[in-house]
């Protein structure tokens, strides 16, 4: 083996070892300093009716309160509570402690106790002097344990390794961004996504994730009889967001769901029918089917279904970056949008839509920018088919296929091929659009009132809403423009659209100081060597198509999810704008705003900033304590 190659391998091995060692060092010294370095360990167990632990000066009991007075301020890392209660119980406790300046403070903390888990854990991390626990009526305190010990948090440890690895790559692997932007971006998404899936485990924090999981699970049986069990029923009802908020409770819930997966097993008949939107669940259903085939535990089966979505997103964005003819940084940046990476780790049909809309636009761009070539017509044909298949999940996006009407004429062999191609575009456009429009027209013709609203409830009715729009068209147009304009900025460039993690949380507005310059900089600023500017006719056509898609999005949600005659359009979410980001950026492309920086710096900024925002969201939302 060549000595230079051997040196490179040795260098990477040393870097990996140092990364792992540094992560362990930060975990032990940074997050376990009081217990690991200073040796401040404690384990105080109090059980009503039992002996008072020697660390306590006194225990005061009054009605539904228990007050524990410690002999001296004691560092307590966590509290474990066991209650005797038949149902979920919200409890609170007051902690009197010394802060870092040895000043006495009083803090109220509330938490939820789930009897299914058998224990409740709360992070304290304080020098406790007095702890007062309030137990609601109907619940009985079995025991309370205050303890502090050196414990490695596997989620935080992996998180630290991931962050250190990213820093190493960004500052030492400039050539990766120049020569292999597609591989680098795909690798970053895969690492971040896998960590998200692993750290979240069995929880439904995505948008309507319980509905999407149910459909994917049913599809995994191929229709007809579906095997049911207690865990499946719990997931379909949606697990509460506060099922757990510590790593210990997460492990208890995972074990509980794994056990219940084999409890009350039975079969149920479900008639899924024919629904084009189900194409968005095929890979997730395949993952669940594979999990059952290999008899995986439920938590692994659940995560495998999510992993299928993530792999589709990674592979799709990899090829979108590779095929992008100019300014590949644009696709890499959009692929790394924190909200979309998070969505790719949940049960949803948004991922196929987003991936195929992106690929369709890139193939169309390749044709109009590169002109006539041997593969131009293949790219264009691929764009049509990809647009068509991708929009089956949400037909309101199918007008994006209309960009294929606007292509250079020289790419066609003759007029016959051109006519056939435009006929194909029209056929796909009409066929997919009818999956959305035709049912509405049929419901209206059959006067199906009271059966076409939101199944979750509310004064909604598609037929009555459609008739309301037709009766008051000017009022609806005014409402439409008011709603679109009021939400335009936050949906396209705010944390709601770019840095939101479902039920977990949305990054605070202070991150907008980084997010907004990043998205606008990526849009308007280019390097002279890689500037992407389309002809005005293409920009105009894209603008018209974007307006049509916006109209369909807002109108579809007004029909389905807004009360009849409402002066507000309900149901529209910022994530629905993601497939429109690339077309909007292309419209705003220009030759005047030129950056004089190297390609490696530009690409590291484009990919590094959204990665940093995603990591910030992870640290605040996931199990770092």
Regions found by a protein language model. Give the residues of each.
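Start-transfer (signal-anchor) and selected internal transmembrane alpha helices
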Residues: 1-32, 151-195, 420-427, 534-543, ...
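Transmembrane signal-anchor helices characteristic of membrane glycosylation enzymes that use polyprenol
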Residues: 15-35, 179-210, 217-255, 426-444, ...
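Transmembrane-helix motifs of polytopic, lipid-linked glycan transferases
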Residues: 169-172, 303-326
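Interfacial juxtamembrane loops and adjacent helix segments
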Residues: 221-304
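Membrane-lumen/periplasm interface segments of multi-pass, membrane-embedded glycan/lipid transferases
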Residues: 262-264, 439-528
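Perimembrane helix-loop-helix junctions
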Residues: 363-372, 398-430
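Membrane-interface alpha helices of multi-pass inner-membrane proteins
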Residues: 378-395, 400-406
């Amino acid at each position: 083996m060549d000595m230079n190659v051997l040196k490179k391998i040795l260098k990477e091995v040393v870097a990996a070892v140092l990364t792992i060692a540094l992560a362990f060092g930060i975990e032990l010294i940074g997050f376990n300093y009081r217990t690991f370095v200073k040796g401040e360990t404690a384990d105080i167990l109090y059980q009503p009716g039992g002996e008072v632990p020697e660390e306590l000066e006194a225990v005061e009991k009054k009605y539904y309160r228990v007050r524990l007075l410690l002999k001296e301020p004691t560092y307590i890392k966590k509290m474990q509570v066991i209650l005797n209660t038949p149902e979920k119980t919200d409890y609170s406790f007051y902690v009197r402690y010394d802060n870092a300046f040895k000043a006495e403070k009083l803090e109220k903390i509330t938490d939820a106790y789930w009897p299914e888990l058998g224990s409740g854990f709360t992070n304290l991390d304080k020098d406790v002097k007095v702890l007062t626990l309030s137990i609601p009526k109907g619940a009985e305190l079995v025991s309370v344990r205050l303890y502090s010990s050196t414990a490695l948090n596997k989620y935080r440890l992996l998180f630290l390794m991931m962050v250190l690895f990213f820093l190493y790559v960004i500052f030492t692997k400039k050539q990766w961004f120049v020569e292999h932007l597609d591989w680098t971006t795909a690798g970053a998404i895969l690492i971040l996504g896998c960590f998200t899936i692993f750290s979240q485990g069995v929880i439904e924090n995505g948008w309507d994730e319980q509905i999407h999981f149910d459909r994917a699970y049913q599809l995994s049986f191929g229709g007809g009889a579906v095997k049911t069990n207690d865990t499946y029923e719990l997931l379909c009802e949606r697990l509460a967001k506060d099922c757990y908020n510590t790593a210990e409770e997460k492990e208890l819930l995972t074990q509980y769901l794994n056990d219940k997966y084999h409890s009350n097993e039975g079969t149920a008949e479900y008639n899924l029918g024919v629904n084009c939107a189900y194409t968005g669940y095929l890979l997730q259903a395949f993952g669940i089917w594979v999990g059952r085939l290999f008899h995986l535990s439920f938590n692994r089966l659940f995560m495998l279904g999510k992993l299928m979505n993530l792999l589709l997103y990674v592979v799709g964005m990899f090829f979108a970056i590779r095929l992008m003819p100019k300014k590949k940084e644009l696709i890499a940046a959009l692929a790394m949008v924190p909200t979309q990476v998070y969505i790719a780790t949940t049960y949803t049909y948004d991922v196929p839509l987003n991936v195929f809309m992106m690929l369709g636009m890139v193939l169309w761009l390749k044709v109009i920018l590169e002109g006539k070539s041997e593969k131009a017509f293949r790219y264009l044909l691929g764009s049509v088919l990809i647009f068509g298949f991708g929009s089956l999940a949400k037909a309101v996006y199918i007008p994006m296929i209309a960009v294929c009407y606007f292509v250079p004429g020289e790419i066609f062999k003759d007029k016959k091929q051109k006519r056939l191609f435009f006929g194909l575009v029209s056929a796909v456009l009409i066929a997919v659009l009818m999956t959305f429009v035709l049912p509405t027209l049929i419901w209206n013709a059959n006067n199906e009132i009271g059966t076409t609203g939101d199944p979750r409830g509310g004064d909604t009715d598609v037929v009555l809403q459609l008739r309301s729009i037709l009766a008051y068209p000017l009022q609806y147009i005014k409402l439409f423009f008011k709603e679109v304009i009021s939400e335009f900025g936050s949906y396209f460039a705010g944390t709601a659209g770019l840095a939101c993690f479902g039920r977990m949380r949305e990054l605070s507005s202070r991150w907008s100081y980084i997010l907004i310059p990043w998205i606008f900089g990526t849009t308007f600023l280019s390097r002279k060597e890689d500037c992407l500017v389309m002809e005005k006719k293409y920009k105009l056509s894209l603008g018209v198509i974007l307006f049509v898609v916006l109209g369909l999005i807002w109108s579809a949600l007004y029909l389905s999810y807004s009360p009849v005659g409402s002066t507000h359009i309900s149901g529209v979410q910022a994530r629905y704008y993601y497939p429109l980001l690339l077309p909007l950026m292309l419209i705003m492309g220009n030759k005047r705003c030129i950056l004089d920086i190297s390609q490696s710096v530009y690409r590291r900024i484009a990919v590094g900033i959204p990665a940093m925002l995603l990591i910030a969201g992870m640290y605040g939302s996931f199990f770092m304590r």
